[in-house]
Amino acid sequence: MFTSSAAKTGRRRASTAKKSEDELVVDRVPNLIDGSISSGPISTGPDSDQNNKKKLPNPFAPKINNLGKDGQTIEQGSMLENKSRENEGDGGSPECVTPNHTDIGTSLGQVTTKGNECHDKYIGRGSPPNERGGSRPSQERGDSFVAIKYPSMLTTLAVMLNYDIHNLYEFMMAVLNVTKELNDPNVLVERAVFDAMQYSRSRGIGDRESYSMFCYMIHGYASLMRLAEEPWSDGVSSNESEIHIKASDMKKSVGVTLTVKPNSLWVCNKNDFARLICIFTLPDDIIAFLRTDGEDCYGGSNIYVGLDISKPPYIPLRDVEEP
């Protein structure tokens, strides 16, 4: 049958379009939960399965730095990775898919997820109940805690410690249950650990050893909540996309402005001077450090904020009684 040149040209164009579609390349977003990315862009071509299975360490995954005398650097999750594997089958994590997208709420505890069947059970609305009067809406805590109202802080902590985000969220929400009435930071941490352990154990989450690392997070989290109330703090301000924390620590003669963008693991302010893992303001017996990788940390170099996890936990875990 005779075929016109126009028809042949049309088929060639269709074939070319099909080939281009098969070879379409899409950038892959780093996986912040398992700390990995693909070895290259995502390919939908004939070798896509093989290409997309290759993974390299995520260059954007945070490192927890050990500022000990020997100058070692501890990689992300190295201390918890083996423990989490050993603990599989002993209660373990809730069988739940980690949400891929989080809507930023307007206050603490207002976290919603898209397409996550575990939303109501593990994320919930507001704080989980405790033994002393049930849950309290997060709004009662007021705007003085604006610095930590974004759930991306919890996500970042989970990534840092290689821990399940649902467990971490429940643990932190249990901590927030007791922060309103308590002023003394030591009592706050003690009581928070007790409440969180009781609540988490009742849900079959984690084990005793896992909580030793949580003490770091608890104190850092509580300290961040107090940041705006410290005498040396210049205050906290925020908008829908950024949090600005200005602080001048007179003991260390340090003045910094930290900018945090919700749902961002690595962030920089307009001067490109701050590159953050997470924000902790800790007492002297737990080292919170600003480590620079340049000559002048306020002149454009990166500033890393993290924890020295070589030291014992702030509150050693024991069979605590209710304070």
UniProtKB/Swiss-Prot annotation:
GO terms for cellular component: host cell cytoplasm. Keywords: Host cytoplasm. It comes from Rice gall dwarf virus (RGDV). Residues 33-49 have a biased composition (Low complexity). Its main location: host cell. Constituent of viral factories. It is found in: Host cytoplasm. Residues 99-115 have a biased composition (Polar residues). This is Non-structural protein 9. Residues 1-142 are annotated as: Disordered. Signal peptide: none annotated. It comes from the Viruses.
